[in-house]
Amino acid sequence: MKLTVNRIVKNWDGASKIKYTTTGFVENPMGPGRRFAKQNIDNELWEDAFKQFNLTNIKKDPLYGNILMNHYKDDAFTHIHQDESQEGHVHVRANVMLKKPEEGGDIIIDDNTYQIEVNDLWLVLASMEKHGSTPIKNGERLLFSFGASVPEKEVEKILQ
């Protein structure tokens, strides 16, 4: 899917302001070596993440919320999938790479692989785009995922 905004914000200023907890991890049943933990985040930072992509008419994602995702075993990856959304809305994720393994952990969106570095922020229209990640090696992948439910009309503004 082509966007009118840059999909990736390199070295996002807000990355250093993210406060997260690594307690409460739950194993992800969708694959080995994957886990996640729900997070509470400052509203201003959450809004700023989406403003980077010109998305302002947003509400908190009621399905998944904000989460910390971790791949911690070699060969762990996120399978290619599309998420659900509420009718008339798009499930949107603004993700920040907090820690990256020596190999892998890059994102895949609609069959395109994007190399992401620590502190990069990227946008996924999770209910419209097939997305996942490449398998990791030699280290772990830790990312913070801001979740939003965005009216379809708002998302149309950033589509080509």
Predicted regions and their residues:
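Non-heme Fe(II)/2-oxoglutarate
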Residues: 1-63
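Short, conserved beta-strand element in jelly-roll/cupin
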Residues: 71-73, 87-103, 147
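Short, well-ordered turn and helix-capping elements at secondary-structure junctions
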Residues: 73-76, 82-84, 111, 128
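Intrinsic-disorder/low-complexity, polar/charged segments enriched in Ser/Thr/Lys/Arg/Asp/Glu/Gln
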Residues: 3, 91-93, 143
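A short glycine-rich, His/Asp/Glu-containing loop-to-beta-strand
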Residues: 54-78
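A short beta-loop-beta micro-motif enriched in histidine and acidic residues
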Residues: 63-65, 77-94
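Catalytic core of Fe(II)/2-oxoglutarate
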Residues: 100-160
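A general structural signal for short secondary-structure junctions and capping/turn motifs
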Residues: 58-61, 85-87, 114-115, 134-137
